[in-house]
Design a protein with these regions (language model features):
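Glycine/threonine-rich phosphate-binding loop and adjacent beta-strand/alpha-helix elements that clamp
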Residues: 8-14, 23-27, 36, 57-73, ...
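A generic structural signal for solvent-exposed, polar alpha-helical segments
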Residues: 35, 39, 112, 129, ...
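Active-site-proximal cap/loop segments of hydrolase catalytic domains
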Residues: 72-367, 371-377, 386-387
Length: 606
């Protein structure tokens, strides 16, 4: 937890910024804060909406601008258009240090004491007016009520199920006092205080839960780790748990533009933690970034976790499911994008059973739900298996096999080539590929690892952006189609100077890197590296091909990559070299999942 802070004068503070002296893990840091965007006025919002209508749709900048709208402070209670639901607007909660934050609380008109769903994230407690087609992308109009805010539960649904919904503006957001601290111990501590305050209200049964996806879930993971006594359970849907490894520096490669995109979208009257500038100031892992890692061991409450196979929150979701200490935890890994998945009726009914069990004490058979349910993707919009029940993840019957790469002909096989070879490519403009054709039906579900022997000619560093994609028997690309757009498949990242492994967390199937030191490459040096892949689940039919694609830059193909993937590479003018065969065995380790049952030609996969 951060200690008491003081504003200081630092040499690298830009105009309009302040620096605060803060302590994390016994280390003292100068943390930079930028002056926030106060949010759009009603008039500015209407002008943005008018221009968007004239041009046939809102641009990314216009959509972000509408997200930054903050309604004027106006505490009152009113009857919503839902008729049987009231909203208590701008309810004040005083935190332990005296800071006041505000929440909008929706609740059904009833004399029965009810549980509360808390939503704690910096995106604002108000529904983002004018953003319907963006914030609910992939969700048909009128699926949710006008009271649903960004990436959060819909009061129009949950209040009618006997729950209150409390949308919170955290410290520094909107009209709440203080400065914004993004996804660290201060944010988590404030969430603890709010939960204990709201569950003490006379209309509450003393139990709270949390649900929301993406940035909302990221905040909720951290709050759950503080163990509020009245937090009964959590539905952690699509949230990262390690900001350094999963957002700021994927594989050690900085991605500050996405953080700028997030900051620009928030309505902040005071100051906000300037994470893009902090990334420049502290490029290596330290206690500042460790403060933004969820302490999974402290989460002991029942948890319903979801992970989308095609989204950048994937790693954090599985890390959370695997590492929390709760004996009551469930995972649903699906092929949808996060937003439509969150509002599908069958998924709402599913999580309602979970909430009813642990927030209302209803014995509804929830414990019979399979601990793990996975979609196994095939091609385009089709799945080989949907919601297949499993016991754990990685799957117990997983068999790890190595596909050895051959630079001589661009092939891959289960035997290491005896002869050494190399392939050279320009990281700025070219890629290199290695292809294997399956001789039998094969399911790959779990963690892949790419082990390479690499050399950089003409520079002392190299960034690797590998993908694993699917081709048909004739070599034609077979994408996964998500919301109408093609998606390639499994991916990984690594800056080779960050190749050092974190031996506390790394395993044979998941090479977790420490990022605590930089090891530049020497001329002529061939360096072994292991690239961590995000989890994946896909089926290859006999005759189809698996192709490893390696690039020196992130190649954008999906629509959402425009906002979340814009890495700052460090390849210089060097040429990348992949060595294979002999003593320089390079391979892709794949998690092959055999059938659950097989007799002769009969195969059952579940």
């Amino acid at each position: 937890m951060a200690e008491e802070v003081e504003i200081i004068s630092a040499e690298d503070v830009k105009p309009g910024e302040i620096a605060k002296k803060m302590t994390f893990g016994g280390e003292e840091f100068e943390v930079l804060f930028a002056k926030g965007n106060p949010g759009k006025t009603r008039e500015e919002l209407e002008e943005i909406k008018r221009k968007a209508a004239e041009s046939g749709g809102a641009s990314d900048a216009e959509m972000v601008a509408t997200m930054g709208y903050c309604a004027p402070y106006n505490p009152h209670t009113y009857l919503t258009e839902l008729q049987d639901v009231i909203c208590e607007r701008d309810q004040a909660c005083t935190l332990r240090d005296g800071t006041v934050i505000y929440a909008d609380i929706y609740r059904p008109i009833t004399t029965e004491k009810i549980p509360v769903i808390c939503v704690f994230a910096p995106f604002g407690k108000n529904p983002s007016e004018g953003m319907d087609s963006w914030q609910l992308m992939g969700v048909p109009p009128k699926t949710v009520s006008q009271y649903a805010k960004f990436e959060a539960p819909d009061p129009g649904y949950w209040c009618r199920q006997g729950y209150a919904v409390a949308n919170v503006d955290p410290r520094g957001v909107g009209n709440s006092q203080g400065d914004v601290y993004l996804w660290g111990s201060q944010d988590a501590e404030d969430g603890y205080d709010f939960i204990e305050w709201v569950t003490a209200q006379d209309w509450c049964n003393g139990k709270a839960t949390m649900i929301g996806n993406s940035g909302v879930c990221m905040a909720h993971w951290r709050i759950a780790a503080t163990r509020p006594p009245h937090l009964a359970c959590i539905a952690a849907w699509e949230g990262q748990g390690d900001l350094y490894r999963e957002s700021y520096f994927c594989g050690g490669i900085p991605n500050p533009d996405y953080e700028t995109h997030i900051i620009d979208a928030l309505a902040v009257n005071n100051y906000i933690e300037d994470t893009p500038e902090m990334m420049k100031k502290y490029p290596l892992m330290n206690s500042y970034y460790k403060d933004k890692i969820v302490d999974w061991n402290k989460i002991r409450i029942p948890a319903y976790v979801t992970a989308g196979w095609v989204h950048h929150h994937l790693r954090g979701a599985f890390e959370g499911f695997r590492r929390i200490r709760s004996p009551k935890k469930w995972m649903r890994a699906h092929r949808d994008f996060e937003w439509p998945d969150s509002y599908k009726p069958e998924n709402l009914e599913d999580v309602k059973r979970f909430f009813d069990r642990y927030c209302k004490g209803i014995h509804n058979g929830w414990e019979m739900t399979p601990r793990v349910r996975i979609d196994v993707m095939d091609g385009y919009e089709f799945d080989y298996a949907s919601a297949r029940p499993e016991e754990t993840f990685p799957l117990k019957r997983t068999e790890y096999k190595k596909l050895y790469l051959n630079a001589a002909d661009g092939s891959a096989s289960f035997e290491n080539p005896a002869t050494e070879a190399e392939v050279v490519y320009d990281p700025k403009t070219e890629t290199t590929t290695f292809t294997y054709q399956f001789t039998e039906d094969t399911e790959i579900t779990g963690f892949m690892k790419l082990h390479l022997n690499v050399e950089c000619r003409g520079y002392d560093n190299m960034d690797l952006f590998p993908w694993v994609i699917k081709l048909d028997k004739d070599g034609n690309y077979v994408p996964i189609r998500v919301m109408g757009a093609p998606y390639r498949g499994a991916w990984g990242f690594l800056r080779c100077s960050h190749r050092d492994l974190d031996l506390k967390y790394a395993s044979d199937f998941q090479p977790v890197h420490s990022h605590e030191k930089e090891e530049r490459m020497q001329p002529g040096e061939i360096v072994p590296v292991d690239v961590e892949f995000y989890p994946h689940s896909r089926f290859w039919h006999k005759g189809e091909q698996l192709q490893v694609v390696i690039a020196g830059r992130f190649i954008k193909t999906e629509w959402f990559h425009d906002t979340d993937m814009n890495h700052q590479t460090d390849n210089g003018d060097g040429m990348h070299v992949i060595h294979t065969g002999g003593e320089h065995d390079s391979y892709l380790q794949i998690p092959v999942v055999p059938p659950k049952y097989q007799v002769g030609d009969y195969v059952y996969r579940g």
